[in-house]
């Protein structure tokens, strides 16, 4: 990306500094050419481009913050609420909450970057992910200062707690002794749906069943989302036939299913009765005017792959763009998981890149691990190179995958280089006896 290449011209003075230093061209001619190019390039600094560039640094908060400040200072780009939200999300991922709040305070007073519900949904999510539940609740209490302490923000807080396995605290917050005074009712279907999904996230299937019955006892109206959540619970708890039974109950009640509900039904019927029955529901939803989305196609492709019908899975992949539904990284991962020949995987990986589908870090790691298990080093290094050239910052799992592949081939020096790079980035490598023993041997040689 142009922005990422331009950023390579600058340096950070220290690990804790975000001041950016420009490199001056030597000659006046080059200087004029550089300024002309810069003025021309600035037209491409739109919100979408900046957000995409920040995403590339999602595994390196210092570089993300450096880029965030650089694009504003060097090009005059005015950050929007979305670009602020993106960098705040990255900072929160690494527990840099003090800097996050400093940025939120910067957003105030600027009409282009006013904090919104998404801003604080991110804050709640990152606090709860770090198991800082009280801090998340305190953040909600501060929302009066932003005119955002409302029903939407409360739902976002409860959703964050339930999503990240703090459902006990969420239930206490809504129905316990220390209920927050909000001025609105929390005994509604939406709150109960969030908590039901929270128990599902914990995998407490007995509690899910108990809570499902409790909703009936307390007279809570079950809507489409309630049924979709409980069907998903039945699938995950190994009882897809019960999800199919719920589907039939929904049809008897003349409930109009949406794409999310249909996706769950297809998965349930496919698992309990076979992929052909899943395809029948796929056709049914289209006949009823509910257009399948990417997740629907991914579900069918996964079922086909699990059934060993790779040709049909590839045919579905080919048809997706014709139906106005572009494949995503999950689509390709469904196929990668079932392919057993390195040449087929590399061919599909090349197709993925050429089609403009950006692999997720999980995709890179999955492929490197697969090649490592088969004892192929070159494909591992090729995937690593592609990842770096795409501007994606490797995480711990990616580093560990390439290090393990190098150790497997006895390339300990190169493995140690990657391990040192990990440490420099603040990532913790796994303890590997091979590398520890080598370090001790080198120390003894130096002493002799």
UniProtKB/Swiss-Prot annotation:
Parts forming coiled coils: none
Coarse class of the protein's main subcellular location: mitochondrion
Sorted UniProt keywords: Mitochondrion, Repeat, Transit peptide
PPR repeats mapped onto the chain: 80-110, 116-146, 150-186, 188-222, 223-257, 258-292, 293-327, 331-359, 360-394, 395-429
Superkingdom as given in the UniProt entry: Eukaryota
InterPro entries tied to this protein: Pentatricopeptide_rpt, TPR-like_helical_dom_sf
Signal peptide (residue range): none
Protein name (Swiss-Prot/TrEMBL): Pentatricopeptide repeat-containing protein At1g80550, mitochondrial
Species annotation: Arabidopsis thaliana
